[in-house]
Amino acid sequence: MKHIASCSFGKDSLATILLALEHGEPLDEVVYCEVMFDKEISGEVPEHRDFIYTTAIPALERRGVKVTVLRSEKTYVDLFTGKITRGPKKGLLRSFPICGRCAVQRDCKLKPILRYQKSLPPDTV
């Protein structure tokens, strides 16, 4: 059985992972889904992105935890400038995401995670 934790590298998810390691809980892999602003620029605050890649990921890897970084083919800019394809607002620009109906969450985070989940063995937790 493979044990995977999803991680945003915020205080809560990172604390959960560190506590699991400290208490000997099984943990084979950590999955982080990075939302990109455009094809080259991360949507993360630059200091947080630096922390993730130069401190957090190397620290987990030193403890024997594989870290997988996922990214969507779509970016924030793609969604912001994309056109609505159906409904009464068909043809209008999507522009700013709306809370509760956020295409960024759906297309830039959830889809890559679900795609990755389908590639895993069925007994993955």
Segments from the language model and where they lie:
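ATP-dependent adenylation/nucleotidyltransferase module used to activate substrates
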Residues: 1-125
